[in-house]
Amino acid sequence: TATPMAHGSSWCNAPCKPTFFLGVLPVSICSLGADFLSSLCTQALIQFLSLPTSLLISAMYLLGQTKSIHISCPKENASSKFLAPYTTFSRIHAKSITCLDISSGGGLGVSSSTDGSMKIWQASNGELRRVLEGHVFDVNCCRFFPSGLVVLSGGMDAQLKIWSAEDASCVVTFKGHKGGILDTAIVERGKNVVSGSRDGTARLWDCGRSACLGVIADCGCSINGVAVGAADNSINLGSPEQTPSEREVGTESKMLLLAREDKKLQCVGLQSRQPVFLFIGSDAFNCCTFLSGFLLLAGTQDGNIYQLDVRNPRAPVQVIHRSGAPVLSLLSFRDGFIASQGDGSSFIVQQDLDYVIELTGADCDPVYKVATWEKQIYTCCRDGLVRRYQLSDL
């Protein structure tokens, strides 16, 4: 595994085995050839680390751009590619950044911080565009609607708000929760949204009328994460006991996934309100996401990432455990996923790649959230920085 230490560097360790330091540093090509410099730096790195011959290192130094280093150990069938940030935004917030999202067009970012602020900024350079003011206390979660012009946020004040990204006005406020809102999900184009709260309830809201359409689940414990996904035709979501409101739009054939504090992962039919499954994990569930119409991921406080098949949820498809640090964010990405943890690690797992992509830079500070747009990946961290990675640099 790798524990990020500083900009573009990591401590790499395995249980009961020697630890070594890996650095991805800026290099000036000057008059040296790129191939020669790459070979020279790789040889120096191997000598410095005194690594076993079974460990192969290849370094790629891109002219004026971010660098990456690929480390593999064929003997252990393990391989990772370490990617340094393309750029870092340090002036968006003054304190820890707890959530972020990128608009559908990739032009704007939105983030919330423990400094009490929520801001919209230019995704290309971090330049501030709007400050969204109206929540009391901290904002726990924020995300763009599919249009990219509207933002949904939830705060410790138990309020859910909708904002215009164009003029920073709050156009809708939802009230009904009795505890702080910890996560949200948007149903299709956004006429309905879902919220999960410390009060133990998950609620469905009508954006057009600023009204609650119903309590989807009452868990009796904090709901740390929520996700909405379209169900595969083979999954029985049950039938609603009452005729759904005409204000429900796009809830049919949708599943709602709830990551609960009491070590349970719950799935219900969004329209039917009927249970689909209840899975008990090793610790509190912090986050969850759908990979497909029947596959999902959920991360726990003790570092486990469960992959489940909704058609047979009793036994996990697999359990990924890289460290005991809390899994804080999971995001479906291409044919795999991106995860971030409380020890500063962020990584990408892809089915078509035989290596893991490690996103470096966070100095052991928790990486709270990951967002993507095309080949760009953004992370937010306790150190108050937004980091942007370019997958084209690999």
PLM segments and residue spans:
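Intrinsically disordered, low-complexity acidic/Ser/Thr/Pro-rich linker and tail segments
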Residues: 1-99, 105-107, 230-246, 254
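Short C-terminal beta-strands that terminate individual repeats in beta-propeller domains
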Residues: 87-92, 128-134, 170-176, 196, ...
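Canonical WD40 repeat/beta-propeller blade segments in eukaryotic WD-repeat proteins
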Residues: 94-101, 137-144, 179-186, 221-250, ...
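Conserved loop/turn motif of beta-propeller repeat scaffolds
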Residues: 106, 148, 190, 232, ...
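Hydrophobic beta-strand positions that form the internal "hydrophobic ladder"
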Residues: 109, 151, 193, 256, ...
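Conserved strand-to-loop turn within each blade of WD40 beta-propeller repeats
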Residues: 112-115, 153-157, 196-199, 207, ...
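WD40-repeat beta-propellers
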Residues: 118-121, 154, 160-164, 202-206, ...
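Blade-level signature of beta-propeller repeat domains, shared across WD40, Kelch, NHL, RCC1
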Residues: 367-394
